[in-house]
A protein has these predicted regions:
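A short, Lys/Arg-rich alpha-helix, primarily the initiator
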Residues: 4-30
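Short basic helix-loop element that most often maps to the first helix and adjoining turn
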Residues: 21-40, 64
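Residue-level recognition of specific faces of alpha-helices
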Residues: 22, 47-50, 75
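The DNA-contacting recognition helix of HTH DNA-binding domains
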Residues: 34, 45-46, 73
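Recognition helix of helix-turn-helix/homeodomain-like DNA-binding domains
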Residues: 42-57
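DNA major-groove recognition helix of helix-turn-helix/homeodomain DNA-binding modules
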Residues: 59-76
Length: 78
């Protein structure tokens, strides 16, 4: 699923309100496993899992994760 604009789906916002970090909320919304995202990014599963624990990833990291999700980097900024 690719987001053509900067909209953030209600399901993602709801998960964030419930306490999930944006990266995790988006991954779950897109029905991706941590392993799949790690493969798309070319990193290990453990390295990706660590990224989901960072409240505000660096811009370069955010852009890489967004590319793996098929969204824009600023959609991970909430």
């Amino acid at each position: 699923m690719t987001m053509e604009n900067n909209m953030i789906p209600h399901e993602v916002v709801s998960r964030i309100v419930d306490g999930a970090l944006p990266v995790e909320a988006w991954r779950e919304h897109l029905n991706l496993s941590q392993e799949e995202v790690a493969k798309r990014m070319g990193i290990s599963h453990s390295d990706y899992a660590q990224q989901e624990t960072v409240a505000k990833p660096r811009k370069a990291t955010r852009e890489k994760i967004a590319a793996a999700f098929g969204i824009k980097g600023d959609q991970l900024e909430l």
